[in-house]
Amino acid sequence: MGGRKMATDEENVYGLEENAQSRQESTRRLILVGRTGAGKSATGNSILGQRRFFSRLGATSVTRACTTGSRRWDKCHVEVVDTPDIFSSQVSKTDPGCEERGHCYLLSAPGPHALLLVTQLGRFTAQDQQAVRQVRDMFGEDVLKWMVIVFTRKEDLAGGSLHDYVSNTENRALRELVAECGGRVCAFDNRATGREQEAQVEQLLGMVEGLVLEHKGAHYSNEVYELAQVLRWAGPEERLRRVAERVAARVQRRPWGAWLSARLWKWLKSPRSWRLGLALLLGGALLFWVLLHRRWSEAVAEVGPD
């Protein structure tokens, strides 16, 4: 990944935000996630209505770095981030310093409105499950509340219902994931063109709009996105270095540590957290004083005159 390309991609994204501040509320940021070979790049091209991301059929990744593309849809400016092999069991080898994962954060800052988990219809495998675990490790457990599952090879349904397929599948892991994602699923035929292609995009972006309404306009965020915003005006290399370090710290923590950190960050972001914290502190101090007073009274009674 060239440093200049990284800087250009990030400058393009931030430039779009600066040039569109008056309509920032209508920007929709999407991240394509999932295992290698599931069809992320082809799905991204279908969403954009143009061949923006390099794509070909195969089991190995042809995407080498996070890349962005954009389009207008209705009154929204849609930004799509395509991702390379950063969600597999080999990610510690393919991205040892977490630079590409940091790059993904920077290109989608201040946070995505939806993560699109791309998987092939009828082929939700152990690799897909591993990719979901990597997504959770990278972004946090709550990220599934912002996730839509996109099945490629819609043509294999042969006119059947996607919801019937999901409901009747014997793949327990898939059923559980769909439930965790609130039942948000759609299917794409990435060879479709014209009105058929646009109908697929309409359905998907309609789900994204539903997520935006559900979350009252809020995009997904965590402590890494917060850092990316703090460093927004730093140089691109410094920004990437700092964010990559934070991502590395997040993914290398034990699961319970990551969960605790996410809950603490969410609690601190709550407008009522300081009041609750103060109440807990005062309550603890009062309890300590009561216990201490009781022990003192008991001690006095023991040594007092008969």
From Swiss-Prot:
Keywords assigned by UniProt, alphabetized: Endoplasmic reticulum, Golgi apparatus, GTP-binding, Membrane, Nucleotide-binding, Transmembrane, Transmembrane helix
Domain of life according to the entry: Eukaryota
Topological domains annotated Lumenal: 293-306
Segments forming domain AIG1-type G: 25-229
Binding positions for GTP per the UniProt entry: 34-42, 55, 153-155, 190
Region listing for G4, in residue ranges: 152-155
Tissue-specific expression: Predominantly expressed in the spleen and to a lesser extent in the lymph nodes. Detected in T-cells.
Stretches the record annotates as Disordered: 1-21
Transmembrane segment boundaries: 273-292
Region (G3) residue spans: 82-85
InterPro entries, per the entry: G_AIG1, GIMA/IAN/Toc, P-loop_NTPase
Listed GO MF terms: GTP binding
Keyword Kinase: no
Region span, G5: 189-191
GO cellular component, one term: Golgi membrane
Subcellular location per the Swiss-Prot or TrEMBL entry: Endoplasmic reticulum membrane; Golgi apparatus membrane
Membrane topology term: Single-pass type IV membrane protein
Keyword Transmembrane helix: yes
Protein task: May regulate lymphocyte survival. Required for normal levels of mature T-lymphocytes and mature B-cells.
UniProt record similarity statement: Belongs to the TRAFAC class TrmE-Era-EngA-EngB-Septin-like GTPase superfamily. AIG1/Toc34/Toc159-like paraseptin GTPase family. IAN subfamily.
Protein name: GTPase IMAP family member 1
Source organism per UniProt: Homo sapiens (Human)
Chain's gene name: GIMAP1
